[in-house]
Amino acid sequence: MLFLISPAKSLDYEHPAPVPDAGVPHFSAAAGELIGLLRQHDERGIAELMDLSEPLAALNVARYAAFSPRPTSANSKPALFAFDGDVYGGLGAHELSRPQVRWVQEHVAILSGLYGVLRPLDRLQPYRLEMGTRLANPLGKDLYAFWRTRIAEHLNERLAGQRAPVVVNLASEEYFKAVDRSELRARVVHCVFQDWKGGAYKIISFHAKRARGLMVRYAALHRARSPRALAGFDLEGYAFDASASEPDRMVFRRRLP
């Protein structure tokens, strides 16, 4: 079973990672191609392409200029500890034991606009490139054209050898669209997180993002081996609702006080 999660815009390069080992991203060469395309844009061009403020555009132009084809401990950090958004707050990697981090390394894939797909301990250099960015490239008009077949093929490689391969999708729609479902040789199970608000259960973005990370945390703590094991998810008040679920769409709900 392989869990898919999205990256985060926020990055943390101030605090050291608690694990020394890190790997090189599988699609490093392809990421280098995209960096080459991004370097063709000045600050104004990046601001327009990504709808960024001038300071953020300047920051990322500097990041692209500094990007190295050889990630090291000095210019990078394991992705699991570098990403710092809501999903990663829920996952709480810094609180996991070494064996639990190793479990995450083997059972989680992080989708990325720049790197395509990452293992959690792959060396991540600072960047910003969302999957929905319309960056023209030799394969098409956007990053979906650039990545789609490659990502699915890589996920198939990671799932090779499993008798009944399952992908648990915890990524956003923007990122999961980069996976070519026609090429993916696995059952896909979607997890949906809803909170009670205004007299109905609704997906509330902040809570849902955090819950996706909590689900990865739960799976690591319990070494989950099948979707059935995820039905016991109970972190921060969520509970599986069988009546609202379908075989490949697991719904978790909660009512906050």
Swiss-Prot record:
Domain of life according to the entry: Bacteria
Short name of one Pfam family: H2O2_YaaD
UniProt xrefs under InterPro entries: YaaA (IPR005583)
Record's GO cellular component terms: cytosol
GO biological process: response to hydroperoxide
Assigned protein family: Belongs to the UPF0246 family.
Protein name according to UniProt: UPF0246 protein Mpe_A2092
Species the sequence originates in: Methylibium petroleiphilum (strain ATCC BAA-1232 / LMG 22953 / PM1)
